[in-house]
């Protein structure tokens, strides 16, 4: 009886030891947090049953019972696709992550597995082909993009569908791009052609003292929001224009930038000495748009004053624009009247406690009358 128990114990120990055989995949993941690049090892493993190990040792080739294990492992590994680096706000701290894609090298892994089993080892290395994303965390670090620098936000609540569509299309074109050191950000160049072929739809734009429909109506929500982010980052302005009249979507008054290619553009220079990386985000429920700027820690502090508004003027007379949704004789309010006014915003940039630059945004707005849509045959259009 004692001999039988000893034999069973030895068999269980041997079985347990054999069951410990693992296929091991080792890699690493890089992150940026609080200005530091950190690399952390990751390990994944797949168990090979003792029966499969014994069968392999017996016939000196991989047992057919291992094939389903390799199939499942391959499916898991190949499902991992490369993901470019992005920053996310995690509990108030900005963290950059990416993901390297994997593809199982099945032949090399099988060779490692067979060799390890026949050598009496309890692990074998999984071999994968790695696909590093074009924009990796390490690339961000190499370019000096280690910190969250500034944020610009705006609210487009009340926008008609066409306007929201153009805002989201425009913002997506400015999501995840670099501004090289010394390079001038050029809004019109980055956005590219604005028409149906690039995803934009027709919407109202300010033209000829009233509203008219053109491709990309609402794109100024995008230019205004990224302007706010880059202005908060302390970048010098090389070109910026205000709208001809105050537009409610762009309050605070004067803290905005209109564009109308090719005559009006937004251009600002990256003078930080390192790359800047721009991310866009939007919330279609809250109707908010946001741009975040990431780069080097320049030691700058930027203070932007509230607008000082003067020189108020009464709204202008109403104007009319064709709208085929309106019945003859009727009218539809498209835009509300606005007073004329002048807004001045002051920006003070400090470094090391000393003022290094100071500038003002002066915006002069003409009086604006209500705009009504009327039937295209309406006499008020004459």
Where do the model's predicted regions map?
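Positively charged n-region of N-terminal signal peptides that target proteins for export
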Residues: 1-4
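General helical structural elements
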Residues: 6-7, 351
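Hydrophobic h-region of N-terminal signal peptides that target proteins for export
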Residues: 9-18
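Cleaved targeting-peptide boundary
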Residues: 18-24
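Well-ordered beta-sheet/strand-loop patches within structured domains
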Residues: 26-30, 40-47, 64, 68, ...
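Active-site-proximal acidic segments at structured loop/helix or strand boundaries
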Residues: 33
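Periplasmic/extracytosolic POTRA-like scaffold domains at the N-termini of outer-membrane
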Residues: 52-63, 216
């Amino acid at each position: 009886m004692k001999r039988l128990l000893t034999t069973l114990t030895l068999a269980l120990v041997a079985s347990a030891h054999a069951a410990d055989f693992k296929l091991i995949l080792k890699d690493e993941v890089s992150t940026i947090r609080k200005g530091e690049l950190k690399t952390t090892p990751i390990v994944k493993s797949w168990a090979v049953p003792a029966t499969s190990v014994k069968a392999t040792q017996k016939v000196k080739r991989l047992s057919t019972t291992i094939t389903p294990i390799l199939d499942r492992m391959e499916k898991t590994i190949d499902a991992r696709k490369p993901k470019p680096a992005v920053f996310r706000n995690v509990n108030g701290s900005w963290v950059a992550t990416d993901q390297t894609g994997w593809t199982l090298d099945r032949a090399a892994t099988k060779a490692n597995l067979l060799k390890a089993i026949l050598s009496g080892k309890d692990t074998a290395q999984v071999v994968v082909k790695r696909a590093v994303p074009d924009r990796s965390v390490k690339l961000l670090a190499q370019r000096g993009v280690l910190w969250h620098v500034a944020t610009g936000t705006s609210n487009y609540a009340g926008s008609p569908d066409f306007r929201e569509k153009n805002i989201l299309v425009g913002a997506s074109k400015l999501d995840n791009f670099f501004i090289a050191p010394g390079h001038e950000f050029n809004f019109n160049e980055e956005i590219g052609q604005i028409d149906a072929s690039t995803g934009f739809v027709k919407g109202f734009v300010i033209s000829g003292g009233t509203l008219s429909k053109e491709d990309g109506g609402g794109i100024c929500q995008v230019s205004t929001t990224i302007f706010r982010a880059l202005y908060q980052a302390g970048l010098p302005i090389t070109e910026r224009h205000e709208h001809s009249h105050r537009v409610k979507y762009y309050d605070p008054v004067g803290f905005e930038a209109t564009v109308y290619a090719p005559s009006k553009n937004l251009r600002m220079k990256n003078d930080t000495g390192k790359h800047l990386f721009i991310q866009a985000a939007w919330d279609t429920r809250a109707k908010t748009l946001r741009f975040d700027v990431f780069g080097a820690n320049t030691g700058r502090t930027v203070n932007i004053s509230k607008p000082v508004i003067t020189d108020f003027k009464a709204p202008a007379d109403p104007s009319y624009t064709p709208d085929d949704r309106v019945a003859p004789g009727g009218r539809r309010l498209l835009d509300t009247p606005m007073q004329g006014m002048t807004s001045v915003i002051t920006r003070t940039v400090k470094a090391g406690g000393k003022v290094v630059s100071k500038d003002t945004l002066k915006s002069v707005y003409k009086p604006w009358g209500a705009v009504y849509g009327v039937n295209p045959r309406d006499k008020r259009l004459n």
